[in-house]
Structure formats: structure tokens, C-alpha cells
């Protein structure tokens, strides 16, 4: 419809322009019976212009034809008005018109003597000229000459629009307006065609939806019957259709169900939230299984975060000491086996007893800080009557020294090798077997005293005593069998405990024992350069 209106407007503008141009050029019109001819003319600049609706008359040929001399033919008076037809040349235009005016003619029509096709504006003196004068082409003059003297054929000289200033301005304005309208119409038509023929470019959305892999990772089910009572249990909220048996439904993390095709299209092309509750559907979706198209960067980025979280959890958890409290039956069984003369493997029994002693020493040290002094004294009396309780030397043996003592003969017998046990005490390997025996006996006698007589700093005493027990084990493994050392140590410990409990107080026995130990250690230090107990 728009295109048709545009074409109609163009046709009307062209017709108007042509009509105005035709009216401006048709100044001389020949009208007869069944005959109408129009000719272009240009009015003379020295003659008055045609006014009103025009001027009517009958054309007559001038004699002489060039009208350079007074005319011999006289114009007839009365209507219609006579017009003189004159050829160009021979004299000036104003002379020709002057001679025609003097002969009684009301208008002078001058035609060209050559077929140049160019109409000129006749110039000359306007003094004394009162009739109309126009200039036409040679062809137009030849046609008018044929109808000369015919009173039944009228000739009209019409006013030319281009001859007035207002007419020129109006024609110029109308022409400019017509050209602008044509150009604007062409521009809009061209623009309309470009918009219609150009392919539609989809507008860029602010949100691009979820990937198809994440959508397919959501759980789905086959509809059988309505099992829940909610807005999406029987009807899809997207297409508003009821579920049919056998249709595939997609379950979002918010537990709302939809047709798989409907919700997949919604999540991948429009939004990532549930159409019903507006909850984000991308939360709570597990990662899809790895495939050939899975990018390697995701796994590489995920591993450091997992390892860092593991380290942080390990660092945040406090260290927990692991200590096992063996039952009394197992302790009795172990020491009974180690004290039997027919024991087939003394090394294995020593291993079991040492391991058990280490665990018990851990328990004793952890409980020592909370025990009062009276509890230490009570434990001393219980140790006197117990024949199967493990010796103090073995109870506080360090794990490092026990492994080097019973597994194999120590490779560091001839050197002073220092090792730090778990409790911060230092143990030493001695060079000679005689010094081993004296030093071990002294340390063995000090065992019960350290465990029963509570000094002012019980924990430091027990830690130092652990180092002495390590020396006992090392000396026993290198000088004599573990069985003999163990039996003699038990006997010495019981004698010391009995004497201390019957003769004097525990504190005095402990002080005397420390003095004896310091004296023997100082003598040994001068011989072997060993540190004190």
C-alpha cells in the first residue's frame, strides 16, 4: 500500500510540473474549427506585457513582410483585433513594431528567419510603442502564415507566467519542492527495501542461559502417576499441558517438574531459574561426567583447591596422642612368658614387654601431672608386693633405644652415641662390659626410688629416669642375657623398696640414692668422660 501511494504521488508531481511548464510556454494559441495549436513565444522587452486572460485577434501577413518600411496593407477596424505577422531581419525590432503600430495593428508577431530553434527576447527603444510584441520560431510563423486572413480562426496571445517576478518565484519554489519530494520519496523507498531485504539479526541478550551439559545432568524421570500435591506434579507450568504416562520429566533442584523439552529450552535460551519459584537451577547440580570434550583446565584448577582444603583441615585438627592401655591379663602373660627359663625366644619376649612398657609409660607420664604426692607413695607400696609388675627400667624405655638394644648387637659399642628419646632424655652407650654392669646396677637400684619417692619435680625425675632405663637395656644386651639382667634387677628393686619402706622414709632413701648415684657417675665420668645421671 505504501509503495502504491508513493508511485501515485510521483505521477501527480510530474503532471503538475509538466502542466505548469506547458502553460508557461503556450503563449500563442491558434484556435479554429476542430483545430487548436499552441506555440512558444517570448515577449519583447520594450513592448508592454499581456495582462489578464490574454488578447484575441486575427493574424494578417505584413506588406512588406520584414516591416522595415511603412506597411502598405492597412488593418481592418472592428473586432476581432488584427495581428501583424512579420519576419525577422532587415531592421531593428522596435522599428518593425513601430511600423505595425502605425498601420493600425494591435499586436506584432515576429517569427525567426532561421531554423535555429532558439527564442530570443527582442530588445529596443520603448518610446512611443503601445501594442504587444512577441517573438516565435520560424516553424510557428510558417503555420500562422497559412491561416493569415481567416476570420474563422482565432489567435490568442496569452500572458507568460515566467515573465512576472512572482511567477518566476512561484515556479522556482514549486520546482524545488517537487524535486525535494521526489528525492525524499526515493530515499524512503530505498530504505524500506533495504530493511525488508536485510536478514533479521537477533538482538544480543544480557543473559545467555545454561549449557546443555549442565541441563542434561539434572535428574529426570518417566511420568506414571501423580505422586505429589504441588503446582507442577500433574501439569507443566511452561506449556500448560497435563503430563501423560510415559513422558519424560525434568526435576529441578527445587523439586519442581516440567516437560524435559520445555524446561531444557527455557534454561538454555532464556533464564537459569525455575519458572515457578524463581530459584536458581544451576545450584546443586553435580558436575557432569568427564568426556572427550571436558576441558582439562577445570580439573587442574580443582585439584589445588581440594589439596589446600585437606591441608587446612589437617592443620586445624589438634594432634591427638595415641596410647593403648593393655589389660592386666596381657601384662601378666607377657612377663610370665619372659621369666620362664624355657623361653624359646628371649628377643621376642623382650620386644613384647618393651612395647607394652612404652605404652604404659605414656599413660603414666600423661597422668603424673594430675596425681598428688600421696598417690606416688601409694603406688610404691603396691610395687613392693607385686612380683610380676614390669621393672621401672623397662617401663620408661625409649622406642629408639629399645630397637637398638634387642634387635641386634649395637654397632656403637665403642663410641659414645647420643640419641634423644621421645621424652627429651639422653642415653649413652658404654665401652666396657664391667662399667656396663656397675652402671646398670646403680641405675637398676634407682628405679624403684624414682617411681615411689615423689621428688619436688616428679615429671623431670621420670624423664631423666627414662634415659637411665635405656642404658640398662643397652648394657644388658651387650654384657649378659636379658633374662639374667631382668631377674637381678627385680631382686634389687624389691630389696631396695622393702628396706626403704621399713627403715626410713621415702624421701631420705631417695636423697641418699641420688648422692650415691652422683658419686658413682662422677667416678665413671672421669674414666669415660660420661655425663651424670
From Swiss-Prot:
Gene3D superfamilies: 3.50.30.30, Zinc/RING finger domain, C3HC4 (zinc finger). Keywords: Disulfide bond, Glycoprotein, Golgi apparatus, Membrane, Metal-binding, Protein transport, Signal, Transmembrane, Transmembrane helix, Transport, Vacuole, Zinc, Zinc-finger. The chain crosses the membrane at residues 168-188. GO terms for molecular function: ubiquitin protein ligase activity; zinc ion binding. GO terms for biological process: protein transport; ubiquitin-dependent protein catabolic process. The keyword Cell membrane does not apply. Its main location: membrane. InterPro entries: E3_ligase_sorting_rcpt, PA_dom_sf, PA_domain, Znf_RING, Znf_RING/FYVE/PHD, ZNRF4/RNF13/RNF167_PA. The keyword Lipid metabolism does not apply. Disulfide bonds join 68-91. Glycans are attached at residue 34. It is a single-pass type I membrane protein. Residues 309-329, 440-476 are annotated as: Disordered. Residues 448-463 have a biased composition (Polar residues). CDD domains: PA_C_RZF_like. It is found in: Prevacuolar compartment membrane; Protein storage vacuole membrane; Golgi apparatus membrane. Involved in the trafficking of vacuolar proteins. Functions probably as a sorting receptor for protein trafficking to the protein storage vacuole (PSV) by binding the C-terminal vacuolar sorting determinant (VSD) of vacuolar-sorted proteins. This is Receptor homology region, transmembrane domain- and RING domain-containing protein 1. It comes from Oryza sativa subsp. japonica. The lineage of its organism: Eukaryota, Viridiplantae, Streptophyta, Embryophyta, Tracheophyta.
Amino acid at each position: 500500500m505504501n509503495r502504491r501511494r508513493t508511485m501515485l504521488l510521483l505521477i501527480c508531481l510530474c503532471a503538475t510540473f509538466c502542466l505548469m511548464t506547458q502553460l508557461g510556454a503556450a503563449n500563442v494559441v491558434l484556435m479554429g474549427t476542430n483545430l487548436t495549436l499552441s506555440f512558444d513565444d517570448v515577449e519583447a522587452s520594450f513592448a508592454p506585457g499581456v495582462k489578464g486572460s490574454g488578447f484575441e485577434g486575427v493574424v494578417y501577413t505584413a506588406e512588406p513582410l520584414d516591416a522595415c518600411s511603412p506597411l502598405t496593407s492597412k488593418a481592418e477596424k472592428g473586432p476581432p483585433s488584427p495581428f501583424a505577422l512579420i519576419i525577422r531581419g532587415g531592421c531593428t525590432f522596435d522599428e518593425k513594431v513601430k511600423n505595425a503600430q502605425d498601420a493600425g495593428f494591435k499586436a506584432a508577431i515576429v517569427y525567426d528567419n532561421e531554423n535555429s530553434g532558439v527564442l530570443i527576447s527582442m530588445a529596443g527603444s520603448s518610446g512611443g510603442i503601445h501594442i504587444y510584441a512577441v517573438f516565435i520560431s520560424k516553424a510557428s510563423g510558417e503555420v500562422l502564415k497559412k491561416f493569415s486572413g481567416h476570420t474563422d480562426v482565432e489567435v490568442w496571445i496569452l500572458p507568460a507566467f515566467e515573465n512576472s517576478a512572482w511567477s518566476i518565484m512561484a515556479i522556482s519554489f514549486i520546482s524545488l519542492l517537487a524535486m525535494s519530494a521526489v528525492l525524499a520519496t526515493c530515499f524512503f523507498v530505498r530504505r524500506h527495501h533495504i530493511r525488508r531485504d536485510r536478514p533479521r539479526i537477533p538482538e544480543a541478550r544480557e543473559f545467555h542461559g545454561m549449557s546443555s551439559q549442565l541441563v542434561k545432568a539434572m535428574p529426570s524421570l518417566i511420568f506414571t502417576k501423580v505422586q505429589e500435591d504441588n503446582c507442577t506434579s500433574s501439569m507443566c507450568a511452561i506449556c500448560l499441558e497435563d503430563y501423560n504416562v510415559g513422558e519424560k520429566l525434568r526435576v529441578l533442584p527445587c523439586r519442581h517438574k516440567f516437560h524435559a523439552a520445555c524446561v531444557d529450552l527455557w534454561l538454555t535460551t532464556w533464564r537459569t531459574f525455575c519458572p515457578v519459584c524463581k530459584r536458581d537451577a544451576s545450584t546443586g547440580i553435580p558436575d557432569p561426567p568427564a568426556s572427550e570434550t571436558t576441558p582439562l583446565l577445570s580439573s587442574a584448577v580443582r585439584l589445588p583447591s581440594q589439596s589446600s582444603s585437606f591441608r587446612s583441615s589437617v592443620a586445624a585438627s589438634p594432634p591427638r596422642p595415641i596410647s593403648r592401655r593393655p589389660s592386666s591379663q596381657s601384662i601378666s602373660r607377657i612377663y610370665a612368658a619372659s621369666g620362664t627359663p624355657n623361653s624359646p625366644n628371649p628377643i621376642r619376649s623382650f620386644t613384647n614387654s618393651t612395647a607394652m612398657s612404652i605404652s604404659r609409660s605414656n599413660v603414666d607420664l600423661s597422668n603424673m601431672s594430675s596425681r598428688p604426692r600421696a598417690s606416688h607413695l601409694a603406688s610404691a607400696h603396691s610395687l613392693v608386693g607385686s612380683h610380676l609388675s614390669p621393672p621401672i627400667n623397662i617401663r620408661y624405655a625409649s622406642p629408639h633405644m629399645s630397637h637398638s638394644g634387642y634387635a641386634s648387637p649395637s654397632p656403637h659399642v665403642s663410641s659414645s652415641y647420643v640419641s634423644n628419646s621421645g621424652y627429651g632424655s639422653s642415653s649413652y652407650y658404654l665401652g666396657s662390659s664391667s662399667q656396663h654392669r656397675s652402671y646398670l646396677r646403680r641405675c637398676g637400684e634407682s628405679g624403684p626410688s624414682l617411681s615411689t619417692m615423689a621428688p619436688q619435680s616428679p615429671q623431670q625425675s621420670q624423664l631423666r629416669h627414662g634415659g637411665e632405663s635405656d642404658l640398662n637395656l643397652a648394657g644388658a644386651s651387650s654384657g649378659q642375657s636379658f633374662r639374667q639382667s631382668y631377674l637381678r634387677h627385680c631382686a634389687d628393686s624389691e630389696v631396695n623398696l622393702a628396706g626403704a619402706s621399713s627403715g626410713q622414709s621415702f624421701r631420705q632413701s631417695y636423697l641418699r640414692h641420688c648422692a650415691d648415684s652422683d658419686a658413682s657417675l662422677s667416678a665413671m665420668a672421669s674414666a669415660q668422660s660420661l655425663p651424670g645421671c
